[in-house]
Amino acid sequence: MSRKKTPKSKGGSEPATSTLPAAAAATNGPRLAHPRTVRPGPEAPPNGPPQSIRPSLGSTGDFYDVAFKVMLVGDSGVGKTCLLVRFKDGAFLAGTFISTVGIDFRNKVLDVDGMKVKLQIWDTAGQERFRSVTHAYYRDAHALLLLYDITNKDSFDNIQAWLTEIQEYAQQDVVLMLLGNKVDSTQDRVVKREDGEKLAKEYGLPFMETSARTGLNVDLAFTAIAKELKQRSAKAPSEPRFRLHDYVKREGRGVSCCRL
């Protein structure tokens, strides 16, 4: 089979409504007003799923039916790279390592309900000096996984600023999920699970806690995203609608021992 690019889509089925914060009001940092609901327009954005579903061959030799771009965003040090390596390679980057410079990506093909779904996962730098670089990649993203570190209160407090940035640069119907990472660090936890749940509910986001070290909920997070994107690309309107929030609540594994 010859190599070919996946064609662009003209639209997906019933894109979900995302609730995002209003723009930052102060120059001293992002202080949000009441969140506002952003509803997608009648036409799908240019980053939509493929128009037709025909097997394609990726650069690694893996065949896939449909491909999507997923971005990992959040402060530096929240574990974006470790989460990606755990999902892609089933390994954990132990010890110290150099933070991501700019942006990097890896591919993985999943079997989702009989369809080969390729996720092109972009790992972004969280440092402020690289923001102008990552902004350019938001526009083409189909999904965003927004991470904070449960042992770092600042990374949690900055989630609202990240949501403001997403509102400005990403597509209106981008799939969003909030992840509280490093849940294995029980003794160092400073952000309660309930706080993450409350914030996610405020902005209408699916939420779960993850651990790149143990693998807790890592595969589930990416699988849930793949299922949602696959559903949007489906041609048959009669197909039962996949509900991302319900799937995450049903399949997610809690860590009650880590609650404060």
UniProtKB/Swiss-Prot annotation:
Regulated by guanine nucleotide exchange factors (GEFs) which promote the exchange of bound GDP for free GTP. Regulated by GTPase activating proteins (GAPs) which increase the GTP hydrolysis activity. Inhibited by GDP dissociation inhibitors (GDIs). A lipid is attached at residues 257-258 (S-geranylgeranyl cysteine). Residues 1-56 are annotated as: Disordered. Gene3D superfamilies: P-loop containing nucleotide triphosphate hydrolases. A motif (Switch 1) lies at residues 90-105. It catalyses: GTP + H2O = GDP + phosphate + H(+). It comes from the Eukaryota. A motif (Switch 2) lies at residues 123-140. Keywords: Cytoplasmic vesicle, Golgi apparatus, GTP-binding, Hydrolase, Lipoprotein, Magnesium, Membrane, Metal-binding, Nucleotide-binding, Prenylation, Protein transport, Transport. It is a lipid-anchor. Mg(2+) binds at residues 81, 100, 123. The keyword Magnesium applies. The small GTPases Rab are key regulators of intracellular membrane trafficking, from the formation of transport vesicles to their fusion with membranes. Rabs cycle between an inactive GDP-bound form and an active GTP-bound form that is able to recruit to membranes different set of downstream effectors directly responsible for vesicle formation, movement, tethering and fusion. RAB26 mediates transport of ADRA2A and ADRA2B from the Golgi to the cell membrane. Plays a role in the maturation of zymogenic granules and in pepsinogen secretion in the stomach. Switch 1, switch 2 and the interswitch regions are characteristic of Rab GTPases and mediate the interactions with Rab downstream effectors. The switch regions undergo conformational changes upon nucleotide binding which drive interaction with specific sets of effector proteins, with most effectors only binding to GTP-bound Rab. Interacts with ADRA2B. Interacts with RIMS1. This is Ras-related protein Rab-26. It comes from Mus musculus (Mouse).
